[in-house]
Amino acid sequence: RSGPLRVTDTPRHKVPLLEKMIAAAEKIGLPFNPDLNGATQEGIGMSQVTIARGRRQSTAYCYLDPARGRSNLVIRQGALARSLVLEGKRCVGVRYAVGSEAREARATREVIVSSGSINSPKLLELSGIGRAEVLKGLGITPVHELRAVGENLRDHYSPRVKFAISTPGATFNDNARGWRLAREAIKYALWGEGFLGMTSVPIRLYFRTRPGLETPDATVSILPFLYERVGHERRISKRRGITMNVNVLRSESLGSVHATSTDPAAPPAIRFNFLSAQADRDGVLAAIRKGRELMATSPLKEIVSEEIAPGPLVQGDDELLDWVRHNAETTYHPVGTCRMGTDPGSTVVDPELRVHGIAGLRIADASIMPTLTSGNTNAPCMMIGEKCAEMALSADLVQKSGISVT
């Protein structure tokens, strides 16, 4: 509780339909779990969130803002990393651009890349680190071959199952327009209260889709409102209802991310290959049906007026999978493209996050995760950053002390 990041429980009394959700979940074998991040994850419970007094506790707010005044910290906004500066097999800096101005930052100790699962492998490839055939295809001279760069991409793939609710005031939709929205805005501005200061996903179910599993392998995240897509925007619907985000927790479908050009501004080729693994197809079908079972159980079934999506006519495996492929979305949890491990042939960084075969270079972001976490990647990424900083500082102290560590 003394760290920089505040973690809070979603207040149970502030979530519409919660008590009905708990009662229905218990009837289908999912007990109320007061701590989904505790000893056991299974059941229905409230989200634990990085929100305090209605404000999201981002890394910028918790870590960067307090450090902005330090003399040993320089922040370059609007900078685009172009490539790493390599001297042989040692990384000594980063080439970057601010607007049209090319610049270079030199390191006296180490370079730590934290560009994320999409851009970290791309930056390595632009620097000549990766699969030789990928690099040569772009006209980049290979400096160091690491075949796992850009491979092993995984993500949480989520169809949205939607239900219309007949009871007035039972969802956030009623408070998202007119004078009620004005009231919510005032509550948020004065006290950080109301639904504007809450997570959009206050309720979660974790469960096993098949016998023999040690831990839950699927989740249904419940949004107590309906929303609509208008172009690239999401807007709360005028219609009253709930949305269920369905996820297979540890996806086995593997994709890739690779540079497409020597131009650092060019987007990479991202191939998720969602649902390519049979286990993922089976898991998402079971999870959709679990969500439907919940909503068809008292006391929820009495207030459900309609299944909006995928709809009551979509029932068979093939029909459901076709609907998922056309409607599911990423949850923006990509991992694994610079995966950690001891084998340079199948991984990119070692257990201390050092890039295999390149001195002075570490990676600290979700790309180093060997597989997906059974939840959001936000907190794990903060842990990776803290651990990487600790290891880099320890290595520096060892070097200065002259002590040999074996």
Predicted regions and their residues:
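Conserved redox-cofactor binding core of oxidoreductases
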Residues: 1-91, 97, 160-183
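General small-molecule cofactor/ligand-binding pocket signal
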Residues: 33, 74-76, 141-145, 221
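A glycine-rich dinucleotide-binding beta-alpha-beta segment and adjacent secondary-structure elements
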Residues: 47-52, 76-87, 218-234, 238-245, ...
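Glycine-rich loop(s) and the adjacent beta-strand/alpha-helix scaffold that form part
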Residues: 83-184, 194-195, 249
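Active-site-proximal substrate-binding core of FAD-dependent oxidoreductases
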Residues: 140-161, 301-315, 393-406
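Flavin-binding catalytic cores
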Residues: 141-143, 206-214, 279-303, 317-326
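FAD cofactor-binding and catalytic pocket of flavoenzymes
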Residues: 162-285, 322, 330-336, 346, ...
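A conserved FAD-binding loop/helix module that cradles the flavin
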Residues: 371-392
